[in-house]
Amino acid sequence: MKTKKNFLNYCHDNAFFGIIQETHLGEMSPGFLVLEGHMRIAFDNDLYLKLQSENIIKRVNQFGDKLYLEFGGKLFDDYHASRVLPGFLPDSKLKMLLTIKDDVEIVIAISAKDIEKNKIRNDIGINYESEVLRLIDAFRSSGLFVGSVCVTQYQDVPVVNTFIKKLNNLGINVYKHYVIEGYPHCIDKIISEDGFGKNDYIKTSHKVVVVTAPGPGSGKMATCLSQLYHENKNGIKAGYAKYETFPIWNLDLKDPINIAYEAATADLADVNMIDPYHLNHYGKLTVNYNRDVEIFPVLKSMFTAIYGKCPYESPTDMGVNMAGFAISDHEASDEASKAEIVRRYYETKVLLRNGKTTENALEKIKLLMQSLNLNEESRHCVLSARKKKEDTGTESMALELSDGTMITAKTSKLLLAPSALILNALKYLAGIPDDIPLLSVQIIEPVSNLKINVLGNRNPRLHVNEVLNALAISATTNPLAQLAISKLHELRGAQALSLIHI
């Protein structure tokens, strides 16, 4: 079940990062606390799809032979967007592409630096190499054509070459783009044989070339620019446009939605800023981010070389994003975005302890929180988790359902805290009294013994996936277990926090 997988991945990577503690069913106290209010829809997804498709088609028709469309964010599962814009569907961008799929070709960019350091996509817990393979399979399964993979900032190191060889063995075309000294400011060198000219020319066969990546900082824009240089040399009139949800250009610079984007990219040191080119030409304030503003002179010079005149007056003009016009409840989006910023703060604290980010990233998020008068407790589940820990004297966890109900669980002998939390949540959703166990000790203990005595694990406590497997087996004879499983989809949109020691 897709919903189950997404929720479990969210729990494992964003709530407690695998360093989870245990809760024993027999010792669970009632954990249902109803808060005022519920999750409000803030975004009209149908309107967004309509507006976005119309705008992309308009941009495609603006250019001649080919359009390079840089896709920012995540195509299949943009959960950041769905968290800060409740009502936004994670696969909206994919649905957009499918409306023009006969004209679309996918190129996936991945940075050699990310391959070398084994960078992880934190929301689903896999490295960028695996994410590239997952994207290829997902695109092809959806009916989209994947033309190639571009390794940007290529370095001749074993781990990078091994990945390239793996792709080649799978029949996937791979191209190399190199580090260009002085990029992005030395325009004369960049637009020369010693710049983009030394990059491989990616051979494409469709009118719309979508350039995407496993995550930010992968070199999507540079890949597009390099291709424009090569297409021009080959006599092909190619254009460029950018499809990125955040920052939302027609919202305020300090809108919580845009600040949440800065929090999400704190490790990249991205900064939202007023687009000076747009302000100078149109006299209007719009929001973009530093990398787009910095690269605009390069783009403008390239377009001037190709067409004699640049078709864009500003970085904002390059974009096609219509998300800002589909926000239906700004108050709800503000609340969701503020909660997301605090969630990113806790996530970054754990990443820092595990050596996977920098102190600067955490300090940046602290400053962003201060700018909106937020603190560590400006998220409902934080208060509930802390109160549970104070009441029980042990590691605790809290989960907020979409209707505002707070579910809690604590550490104990046979179950990890998230495992017990899931069972508590399912019992609440199914209307099962708290004192009725979904899984008996007779079911849990044999699994625990198997882990310790046969598989050699030191921790006897059941993980979430093990508990759900046991629950599924129990459902064949236990109607309550079957009822609980039927409620799994209602965990979509849940917010969780675990207070544990690392």
Q: Predicted segments — roles?
A:
Residues 35-176:
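Long, basic/Gly/Ser/Thr-rich N-terminal segments
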Residues 73-105, 110-126, 248, 252, ...:
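Conserved mixed alpha/beta catalytic, RNA-binding, or beta-rich assembly cores of soluble enzyme
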Residues 179-196:
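N-terminal pre-Walker A segment at the start of P-loop NTPase domains
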Residues 208-228:
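Glycine-rich phosphate-binding P-loop
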Residues 235-249:
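Short beta-strand-centered segment that lines the nucleotide-binding/catalytic pocket of NTP-utilizing
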Residues 251-294:
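Conserved nucleotide-sensing/catalytic segment adjacent to the nucleotide-binding pocket
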Residues 433-495:
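Cysteine/selenocysteine-centered motifs that mediate thiol-based redox chemistry or coordinate metal-sulfur cofactors
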Residues 500-502:
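Conserved small/polar residues in nucleotide/adenosyl-binding loops
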